[in-house]
Amino acid sequence: GCHCESGMPIHKTTKLETNNAEIAALAAPRPLKLISVGGDWTKNTPKVEYPYAQSIYKYFNALDKVENSHFPKEKHGYEYIKRQAMYPFMAKHLKLDTTGVLDKRSGDYDETGNTIETTQIMRNFHSATEMPVHALKPGSIVQFR
């Protein structure tokens, strides 16, 4: 998997164990879009994680707020086809005006006005030594009081 979102240190510690389905379902009843592909660990999302998320959303009477778009022939990444699946979901739930970005004939959203930032620009901290002294260290247990 990719360290960008599989986050194994948060899945299993000496004191707790969870999985992506449980973490995703924490969003309930807020809108949740699961985008999955056949070429990585999300390949089972339509049969495992998505039905689990639906079962949690059902408790909140919010089945209309959870969706899955699955691309069985795609590999890991967030390419154009996957972003195109996300845009209508976001437009619906954020009540966005799609005028000027949605091509009503093709159904595609125009991305030409988007700026792709470099990794360096997007980072809050450029190294572990720049993190605040009070920041949680990897593997820390969060305690609620």
Locations of the language-model features?
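Primarily recognizes the serine-hydrolase "nucleophile elbow" in alpha/beta-hydrolase
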Residues: 1-16
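Beta-rich catalytic cores
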Residues: 19
